[in-house]
Amino acid sequence: MCGILAVLGCSDDSQAKRVRVLELSRRLKHRGPDWSGLDHHGDCYLAHQRLAIIDPASGDQPLYNEDKTIIVTVNGEIYNHEELRKGLPGHTFRTGSDCEVIAHLYEEHGESFIHMLDGIFSFVLLDSRNNSFVAARDAIGVTPLYIGWGLDGSVWISSEMKGLNDDCEHFKFFPPGHLYSSKEGSFKRWYNPPWFSEVIPSVPFDPLALRKAFEDAVIKRLMTDVPFGVLLSGGLDSSLVASVTARYLEGTKAAELWGTQLHSFCVGLEGSPDLKAAKEVANFLGTIHHEFHFTVQDGIDAIEDVIYHVETYDVTTIRASTPMFLMSRKIKSLGVKMVISGEGSDEIFGGYLYFHKAPNKEELHLETCHKIKALHQYDCLRANKATSAWGLEARVPFLDKEFVNVAMSIDPEWKMIKPDIGRIEKWILRRAFDDEENPYLPKHILYRQKEQFSDGVGYSWIDGLKAHSALHVTDKMMLNAAHIYPHNTPTTKEAYYYRMIFERFFPQIDSPWRSKCGLQHSKSY
């Protein structure tokens, strides 16, 4: 993943302002350590920190149309860029970057081109012909994006909060599936599939159709010009990602460049459930498996860095982000720049254990809709920022736009958990990949019950975090919690500890994590 920063409609075009924009952009350098770029046009600055995955040699940003009147800075991957290029025969491309197509599509189709993109993205596009700009974020919010406003009337857009919190009067999450137009001065939703209205779907479950949709999602994400691998915890989701990747790797450009044997990566405390399960799956699939160990103290020592990079004080997110953060550093040290990961399945298929309590299919469907809509604040945040902290890109096929649309169109009766007839959580996903003749996974892995990521890496991890937090937060401090933190008041010592660290890094009163911006924290146990 790359990092983008844009300052638009800025009243100050001095050299000092340019230096300041560069300084703020460097705060995102971990996201894109391969190249830094800046375009200054009139009262607008577009900065970019590049992680080179596609066309490393010539794809530096910002990117332009032929006469450089359209300027764009992008964080993302456009998986159908080759097909889109074929539909632009009159255009000349300067690079092989998948993102350059955005500038030419806008020139040809205006803002409506966004519906043509198949991928994940956050971008800011400046049209210097009329000094207007548009900014947009992908359907689910896989790529992070924030928008802020300055006292001078400027609009600021950044991949991370740390690019905005010192210079903006107010900032918030840029909503997923939306486009912001300076001409209108407002957001409009571009992603509005049938499931988004929360109407109960009625399409019968077709195992082969669901399998095909997921395989297509994984195959798209094999688009890379750099070494890659898969994150493998040994649970259902990551194991399916690894299995499909291994099955379809041969014959791809990635295989031609880096070989047909897939690399897999797992992290855990010594003796943790994930390490054991991941090794079994890796042996079954024949991957080159890399196992990383960490201690509870290693994780505790990394907490401040995790909160700084992931930019949250949500307890569950921090617990799960820390092992991922540590693993990402190890993976990057091996020369790998991209991994494929399994986030999103639990939200789509009702995989969390509390879904056992769903009273009917209507309530289950509504809850899955709400969980998917909130993903950008939790698992997407973790998967993107815990990896990007080390210049590693994570791709998440379960959150492929087309796959989500297929999975969310299925009658939710099929997602209901019914132990009496053998339907455990995510039964339809398991059933879709239950192939007797050419198995994707061993049966006991395919039907392994879900564990929380932070439990799977080792049961003592959470206990260690709670004990460490108790050393820093007293009972007396907890009595004043509602006065010190009136918004999203921490109710446990662990939550209070994370909040103290967060406030030290991001002290601005108006941050996206305030309740007025709609955040509801996930439950932790």
Swiss-Prot record:
- Give residue ranges for domain Asparagine synthetase: 193-517
Please list the reactions this protein catalyses: L-aspartate + L-glutamine + ATP + H2O = L-asparagine + L-glutamate + AMP + diphosphate + H(+)
Could you tell me which Pfam families the record lists for this protein? Asn_synthase, GATase_7
Q: Which residues does ATP bind? A: 231, 267, 341-342
Keyword Amino-acid biosynthesis among UniProt keywords: yes
Report the EC number(s), separated by commas if there are several: 6.3.5.4
Statement: the UniProt record of this protein carries the keyword tRNA processing: no
Instruction: Tell me which GO cellular component terms the UniProt record holds.
Output: cytosol
Q: What does the record list as GO biological process? A: L-asparagine biosynthetic process
Instruction: Output the Gene Ontology terms for molecular function.
Output: asparagine synthase (glutamine-hydrolyzing) activity; ATP binding
Which residues of this protein are annotated with the site description Important for beta-aspartyl-AMP intermediate formation?
Answer: 343
Family annotation (InterPro entries): Asn_synth_AEB, Asn_synthase, Asn_Synthetase, AsnB_N, GATase_2_dom, Ntn_hydrolases_N, Rossmann-like_a/b/a_fold
Which residues are listed for L-glutamine binding in this entry?
A: 50-54, 75-77, 98
Task: Report the pathway entry.
Answer: Amino-acid biosynthesis; L-asparagine biosynthesis; L-asparagine from L-aspartate (L-Gln route): step 1/1
Annotated Glutamine amidotransferase type-2 domain residues? 2-185
**CDD domains assigned:** Asn_synthase_B_C, AsnB
Which residues does the Swiss-Prot or TrEMBL record annotate as the active site? 2 (for gatase activity)
Q: Which PANTHER family match?
A: ASPARAGINE SYNTHETASE, ASPARAGINE SYNTHETASE [GLUTAMINE-HYDROLYZING] 1
Per its database record, what is this protein's job?
Could play a role in remobilization of nitrogen in flowers during senescence.
Its protein name is Asparagine synthetase [glutamine-hydrolyzing]
